[in-house]
Amino acid sequence: MAEFRKLVVKIGTNVLAREDGLLDITSISHLADQIAAIKEAGTEVILVSSGAVGAGRSLFEVPEGMSKVVRRQVLSAIGQVRLMEIYRQLFANHGLFCAQVLATKEDFQGHTHYNNMKNCFLALLRDKVVPIVNENDVVSVSELMFTDNDELAGLVAAMTNAQALIILSSVDGLLSAPPGEPGSQVIREIPYDDKRWLKAITPSKSSFGRGGMHTKFRIAQKAAKVGITTIIANGRRANILSDILKGDFIGTRFLPAESLSNVKKRLAYHESESKAAVYINSGAETALCSTEKASSLLPVGITRIEGDFQKGDIVRIFNAEGQPVGLGQAQYGSDTARQYMGQQGKRALVHYDYLYIE
């Protein structure tokens, strides 16, 4: 397997917790030892760690009558302190520091917040520090929540230009059939654009976490599409991280497309930030989706614009049937775009360098 200069490792709740939901210190310690060895070998590592709620559960008994949302907020707020203290002690044994990074979905949507977080990651990685990322459950509720930490890990991997995303769960990878059925086995490799195996995935979630294999498949394939090698493996297997870097492991590897620019990676993860919808004709769709020639979105191919936007805003692009084609950063506002719509010889609304095709 190719060498990776930068990794994002996501450790799921079922890897960090015992069957009773409390933290498994032995499992956490084993993974911390592997991460320390990887850093010692010269690879930068960002850790996305679940487990705060489980840590809180071991320390505090939530009063009766508390709502599910508030219960999660309280346990996470208490448990995050305990979780970080465990990591601090474990990494200190290797002469490493750890840094807490708590994120919300909004931090990845605003341009200023996004750049501030990215610069913080880059600064931390220059030193002997392991950034440890978790969702800020205290303020993340309902629509502001990530699907789970798999989604957060994918966003961090794209933001930091990581070469690989490793998602550790309590199973060996994606299976070709539901567990226990004849012929069920781990799918070793999946191309970034191959969705054939999605129907084989059992639609269930983990015991203590929010996500499941459907989510992992979607996140892994999206990361692979923007050029990030993505691996789903069993975090409870001995030396799993070391084995992955050696290329000798049990798990599912999503084969990546050619790596995209940082701008295109950001666009790929920002559907929710789009300010308006731009509809295009079949000719423009063919040009934009061509793999032989890079094309920008020209006004002559635009048929309709819904909503208003300014220069620099992200717009969602749809074809004549209303199916999503991609996202792009507008070079001018919607007023000018409506004036230019359908005309030849006008400047591109979205330049190819600022265009992501889904």
Language-model regions: role of each:
Residues 1-97, 101-358:
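C-terminal catalytic "cap/lid" subdomain
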